[in-house]
Amino acid sequence: MVMRIIGLYGHANCGKSATLNILKELLRCAGNSISTVPHPNSDTPETFEYKGLIVSVAPGGDTRAIVESNCRYFKLKNCDVAISATRTRWGSAEALNEFAESEGVKVDWVPKSYEYNLSEATKTLCNKETAEYLLRKL
């Protein structure tokens, strides 16, 4: 099976990591974490079995070095679907594109924007909605 790569991109503090941590929790509930040490609510990647797929989620993605580390993790886990946060700056998106190219695929980019002047509860709902959207894409 060819690896699918999904990149959640946006500027700093727009909720990318929070969204992917919600996705990790959704996958934990609907599937099965196969990481030796689960990492809820952190930038540490985690791998799940979901609907017969191996899905790796990496909430960290602020720099090229972090995304390159995520990509090594994806390769090590031999996942069917790799999901990483990336920034719009600092080379992280380029690193994910380069990894996708090395795998012979293209990144499925999903934008994440920050809505100013929203309550924390509303921001959390927006992050949850994006996480549910990502889950449906699997």
Regions picked out by a protein language model, each given a short descriptive name:
Residues 16, 59-67, 123-130:
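Phosphate/oxyanion-binding active-site loops and adjacent basic polyanion-contact surfaces
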Residues 32-93:
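Conserved nucleotide-sensing/catalytic segment adjacent to the nucleotide-binding pocket
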Residues 22-23, 71-72, 96-99:
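Short, glycine/charged-enriched secondary-structure capping and boundary segments
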Residues 4-27:
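Glycine-rich phosphate-binding P-loop
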Residues 27, 31, 100:
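Active-site catalytic pocket residues across diverse enzymes, especially alpha/beta-hydrolases
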